[in-house]
């Protein structure tokens, strides 16, 4: 293989947020019903990890299932509660008074915390969780992560963490404002949301 200039890509171990039951597990209310008829009805969230320049970078977005828009996200060098809180507050700031979205996640430790669940309750957000070890229960977010990593991470070298973080910001802007989708009638996620208002 070396003589042909071929290299093997080895996948690193995936980040696992599940640390057992450290708090309350919510039922799977979303139950793989990924269709929403209006903005802010159904949101999904998760955390993914990137190894960049001997560091780890964690991305945690919230996606609206109505138009697949990333309504809020946070980037951190460690998976911590403040990252979860930051992205949640960003999403809450976009809610209308009458909105009561379902927010679906896996059973990661941060989603089991009382302080996280209190923020949801205080803002009329209904918590939903995937069954343990079942990534298909959050397939839309897993699909987003997979596409993101193929398009801007795998096979690329970043010279610094800050360059990579900038590339993440640019990718999410591209996803929301430039990437058209046949499922959205040839519009971008932001155009589709604006068209529905």
Short names for language-model regions:
Residues 1, 30, 46, 62, ...:
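Mobile genetic element proteins and their domesticated derivatives, centered on retroelements
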Residues 1-38, 134, 188-197:
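Basic, flexible linker segments flanking DNA-binding modules
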Residues 19-21, 105-107, 113-114, 129-149, ...:
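RNase H-like two-metal-ion nuclease catalytic core shared by retroviral integrases
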Residues 26, 40, 59, 80, ...:
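Hydrophobic (often cysteine-bearing) scaffold residues that line and stabilize catalytic clefts
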Residues 36-71, 77-81:
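An active-site-proximal beta-strand-loop segment
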Residues 67-73, 127-130, 154-155:
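Short small-residue beta-strand/loop micro-motif enriched in glycine and branched aliphatics
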Residues 74-97:
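Active-site beta-loop-alpha junctions of metal-dependent nucleic acid enzymes
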Residues 114, 121-125, 147-197:
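C-terminal domain-tail junction helix/linker
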């Amino acid at each position: 293989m070396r003589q042909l200039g071929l290299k093997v890509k080895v996948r690193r171990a995936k980040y696992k947020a599940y640390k057992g039951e450290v708090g309350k597990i919510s039922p799977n209310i979303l139950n793989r019903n990924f269709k929403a008829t209006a903005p802010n009805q159904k949101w999904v969230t998760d955390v993914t990890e990137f190894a960049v320049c001997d560091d780890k970078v964690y991305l945690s977005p919230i996606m609206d299932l109505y138009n697949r828009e990333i309504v809020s996200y946070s980037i951190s060098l460690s998976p911590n509660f403040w990252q979860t809180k930051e992205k949640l507050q960003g999403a809450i700031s976009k809610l209308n008074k009458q909105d009561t979205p379902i927010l679906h996640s896996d059973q990661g430790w941060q989603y089991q915390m009382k302080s996280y669940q209190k923020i949801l309750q205080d803002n009329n957000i209904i918590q939903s969780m995937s069954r343990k070890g079942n990534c298909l229960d959050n397939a839309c977010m897993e699909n987003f992560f997979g596409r993101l990593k193929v398009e801007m991470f795998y096979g690329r070298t970043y010279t610094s963490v800050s360059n990579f973080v900038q590339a993440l910001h640019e990718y999410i802007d591209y996803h929301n404002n430039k990437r058209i989708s046949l499922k959205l009638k040839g519009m971008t996620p932001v155009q589709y949301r604006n068209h529905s208002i």
